[in-house]
């Protein structure tokens, strides 16, 4: 059993100490809770996670559901875990990467952000037409042939841009993609 310093101090443990069955059970429970808390700290320090995502990751890593729930509550009480802030961070990263609205929603879903925070986080999502035009301009050499244009359009769709916005950007660039887009 791995014990953290705090647990050792809480139980007043020393080499050769004998514990009753009740004390051993309490020690195991405390060790499990502390393990979940420390693992939660490591996870939160390395990536943006929601409360649900953190709890599921802790359980997946071998923590008990009760210890995982208590660790998430502990992190929330210390204000180290906030789904609203996490949602805003995820949306900001999606905007920086040039993703469309659909891809941003997918990222929020993947991180298990509760839907009640989606609307606020996505409220200021900018129109992505400029990002689409920049992408099309950067891949202009691919647009000369129909196969290259289709690949470029498919890449934009994978980035979460809507068909309507891509078509508008193509029209803005004065490219006629009608034949290709109907495939």
PLM feature spans:
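An alpha-helical, amphipathic repeat domain used for nucleic-acid recognition
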Residues: 1-183
């Amino acid at each position: 059993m791995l014990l953290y310093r705090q647990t050792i101090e809480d139980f007043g443990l020393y080499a050769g100490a004998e514990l009753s069955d009740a004390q051993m059970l309490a020690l195991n429970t405390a060790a499990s809770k502390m393990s979940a808390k420390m693992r939660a700290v490591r996870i939160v320090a390395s990536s943006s996670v929601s409360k649900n995502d953190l709890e599921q990751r802790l359980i997946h890593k071998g923590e008990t559901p009760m210890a995982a729930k208590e660790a998430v509550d502990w992190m929330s009480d210390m204000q180290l875990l906030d789904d609203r802030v996490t949602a805003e961070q995820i949306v900001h990263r999606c905007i920086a990467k040039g993703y469309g609205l659909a891809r941003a929603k997918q990222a929020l879903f993947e991180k298990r952000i509760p839907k009640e925070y989606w609307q606020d986080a996505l409220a200021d999502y900018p129109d992505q037409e400029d990002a689409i035009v920049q992408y099309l301009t950067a891949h202009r050499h691919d647009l000369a042939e129909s196969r290259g244009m289709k690949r470029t359009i498919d890449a934009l769709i994978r980035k979460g841009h809507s068909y309507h916005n891509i078509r508008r950007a193509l029209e803005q660039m004065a490219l006629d993609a009608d034949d290709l887009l109907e495939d």
